[in-house]
């Protein structure tokens, strides 16, 4: 019995506890990221934004949560009820699953697997199924059209993100997220992070992440002027909330990936005191919020692309450009003798 406790039950309880703690912290982070998104958008438009609920509007997201929970969920008469209700759950759970392998500090990760980047790419690819299920089961033309757009859009830009990962892999020699951060730990500080030598790759990743998460200017899936609310037209109450939660969790995942792949993860920008006194998780959060600020500014200042422009950018610009960058990075590493052994 003692062996069963120490070998199986206790490790299982530890993982469950870590997962619940991560979930709670992630949900609180999402609440304030959503508020920051609205505040940034308001500032660009010279408005005040949410400022009534709580001091400076800090409790606005929790008020919105209560509003959604107490609304009545509606199911269209011709909808496939099972698939209709399962779709938001699939979208949300798959978005949350990606955080199992993301290290927020040295050793602070639930599963430190050697293929962490591929795991995140695979899980984010599966999240499109939730949108397709919602579009098909709603028995409405607008959600169905949005689901078709989403499938094409996510497949198109996952290719570019895949080549971005290959470029970073060539520099590091590992798909382990912790190893990628440690490879950027040099005496040069932020000048040794991959955003500088791989700047074109960083730009490709940033724009592809916008498209992958259906953020403006690539929000063709839920284009208000064309498709009302896209695949979420027929949803209300908690199912709608789950879709929103899945969307913002996916955004935080991409922000965390950008911080790890290009901004040194939890490493300080200057590897000397007093910067080294700051806990690594604080640096990780600051870099994640910087990436989200770039996401929010794109929403505030860039007009929406047409669908044909979106596809053209993905297949005719980013795909060949990312492939060329992979070849250039591989060539430079080989001829300069910098390739990882």
Swiss-Prot record:
This protein's UniProt keywords: Cell inner membrane, Cell membrane, Membrane, NAD, Quinone, Translocase, Transmembrane, Transmembrane helix, Ubiquinone
GO MF terms, alphabetically ordered: NADH dehydrogenase activity; oxidoreductase activity, acting on NAD(P)H, quinone or similar compound as acceptor; quinone binding
Main location: membrane
Subcellular localization: Cell inner membrane
Residue ranges crossing the lipid bilayer per the database entry: 13-33, 82-102, 115-135, 161-181, 190-210, 248-268, 277-297, 317-337
Membrane topology per record: Multi-pass membrane protein
Single GO cellular component term: plasma membrane
Catalytic activity: a quinone + NADH + 5 H(+)(in) = a quinol + NAD(+) + 4 H(+)(out)
Catalytic activity, EC: 7.1.1.-
Superkingdom, natural source: Bacteria
InterPro entries in the record: NADH_UbQ_OxRdtase_su1/FPO, NADH_UbQ_OxRdtase_su1_CS
One GO BP annotation of this record: aerobic respiration
UniProt xrefs under PANTHER family: NADH DEHYDROGENASE SUBUNIT 1, NADH-UBIQUINONE OXIDOREDUCTASE CHAIN 1
Function: NDH-1 shuttles electrons from NADH, via FMN and iron-sulfur (Fe-S) centers, to quinones in the respiratory chain. The immediate electron acceptor for the enzyme in this species is believed to be ubiquinone. Couples the redox reaction to proton translocation (for every two electrons transferred, four hydrogen ions are translocated across the cytoplasmic membrane), and thus conserves the redox energy in a proton gradient. This subunit may bind ubiquinone.
Record-stated family: Belongs to the complex I subunit 1 family.
Cited NCBIfam families: PRK06076.1-2, PRK06076.1-6
Subunit annotation: NDH-1 is composed of 14 different subunits. Subunits NuoA, H, J, K, L, M, N constitute the membrane sector of the complex.
The name this protein goes by in its record: NADH-quinone oxidoreductase subunit H 1
